[in-house]
Amino acid sequence: MMKKLLIVSVKAYQKYISPLSPPSCRYKPTCSAYMLTAIEKHGTKGILMGIARILRCHPFVAGGVDPVPEDFSLMRNKNTSKNAEKA
């Protein structure tokens, strides 16, 4: 139940609030898409992963590819980012 409520909240943000400002996320997938995937994979702990990701998304970071890790972690998935840069 809580998981569904969180997902609906993020989807409402994506549909109604996000379009009001220009795209500014420095990561792929976007921070809101990351949070959705994190919640789907890790349940309510995924919200912590999403918040950590939002805190990492600012003008002083290069950004890049940062998918949701299979195991719960609040850190950026650095191995995937390096592999994406080589490709």
From Swiss-Prot:
Subcellular location, record wording: Cell membrane
Bilayer topology term: Peripheral membrane protein
Q: Does the keyword Lipid metabolism belong to this entry?
A: no
Q: Which domain of life is it from?
A: Bacteria
Q: What does this protein do?
A: Could be involved in insertion of integral membrane proteins into the membrane.
InterPro entries from the UniProt entry? Membr_insert_effic_factor_YidD
Q: Which family does it belong to?
A: Belongs to the UPF0161 family.
Q: Which UniProt keywords apply?
A: Cell membrane, Membrane
Q: Which NCBIfam families match?
A: membrane protein insertion efficiency factor YidD
Q: Where in this chain does the entry annotate a coiled-coil region?
A: none
Q: What is this protein called?
A: Putative membrane protein insertion efficiency factor
Q: What GO cellular component term, any one, is given?
A: plasma membrane
